[in-house]
Amino acid sequence: MNASVLGLCLSGPLVLLLAWLAPPVTSSWWYMRAAGSSRVMCDNVPGLVSRQRQLCHRHPEVMRSIGLGIAEWTAECQHQFRQHRWNCNTLDRDHSLFGRVLLRSSREAAFVYAISSAGVVFAITRACSQGELKSCSCDPKKKGSAKDSKGTFDWGGCSDNIDYGIKFARAFVDAKERKGKDARALMNLHNNRAGRKAVKRFLKQECKCHGVSGSCTLRTCWLAMADFRKTGDYLWRKYNGAIQVVMNQDGTGFTVANKRFKKPTKNDLVYFENSPDYCIKDRDAGSLGTAGRVCNLTSRGMDSCEVMCCGRGYDTARVTRMTKCECKFHWCCAVRCQDCLEALDVHTCKAPSSASEGAPT
């Protein structure tokens, strides 16, 4: 269907709805991972709004932490989606990092905004505790004595200053969304907040005992963030349970698209639009397709050849790899192995036929 015919088919209200939901192709602070020095980064990363540039110039060391943290949360995103058709692939030369795929207000967009916001909190908070930032240090509120279910303890060590991480992340990450008043901006703000809350959810108290023979007559405790994988796993569960919403009548909030489902909480991820199937390469949708992706012949999950390859079939190639074998334990403290060649079959998804290459997803 060409553009002129499509324009005739869309009614006025529907055109307005699509314009309301679809943001323009823009750059993002996510592109900061490719920047060099802080001054170059602040002045040349496309897409930063004025408030973000102000924070960038005032806190160059924080920006460095954010930039380094981008690799960590993108790797976590790729880990969580490793067995799915869309695998959170990034585009090094794209200013938006993920290309057009996140222009759709989908579950995937909800997850990426949440995990990126969480990643900023994690990176800044960790940098505070490691003494890398002038603007913060350990949590100043964790001093003196306190009580828990095990009795009295003294705050000591270095408690992670997660409140600072959350405050800075909110100011920096949310700045662009707060300039917009459309539905997508509200969706992004909601998912950004859910990501920040997820990091704090796994803040844990760690203690060290002092006393004769470890009797723990005196305890010193501090608060520490859990490994970022816990945040990733939690947000992955929220992705699978994400709630589809529509804007309320006054345009200030959400209501569930299906009245049978519960209203989303601040911890839930929300989205507006259904996802494409990601089966074929579609430049407009930002989908790279699954041609050439490795699939699991024995799996019944999303990584199975049947699901991953979208019914197109798969190719099988015999490959060899070096593995450790014939390992033996040597007294007292060593295990010695030989290097062996192992042959195995690798299955990869077939490309779509020329007839279906341009078919809509």
Curated annotation (Swiss-Prot):
CDD domains: Wnt_Wnt2 (cd19345). It is found in: Secreted, Extracellular space, Extracellular matrix. PROSITE patterns: WNT1. Keywords: Developmental protein, Disulfide bond, Extracellular matrix, Glycoprotein, Lipoprotein, Secreted, Signal, Wnt signaling pathway. Its main location: secreted. Pfam families: wnt. GO terms for biological process: atrial cardiac muscle tissue morphogenesis; canonical Wnt signaling pathway; cardiac epithelial to mesenchymal transition; cardiac muscle cell proliferation; cell fate commitment; cell proliferation in midbrain; cell-cell signaling; cellular response to transforming growth factor beta stimulus. Disulfide bonds join 77-88, 128-136, 138-158, 207-221, 209-216, 279-310, 295-305, 309-349, 325-340, 327-337, 332-333. GO terms for molecular function: cytokine activity; frizzled binding. Palmitoleoylation is required for efficient binding to frizzled receptors. Depalmitoleoylation leads to Wnt signaling pathway inhibition. Ligand for members of the frizzled family of seven transmembrane receptors. Probable developmental protein. May be a signaling molecule which affects the development of discrete regions of tissues. Is likely to signal over only few cell diameters. This is Protein Wnt-2. The lineage of its organism: Eukaryota, Metazoa, Chordata, Craniata, Vertebrata.
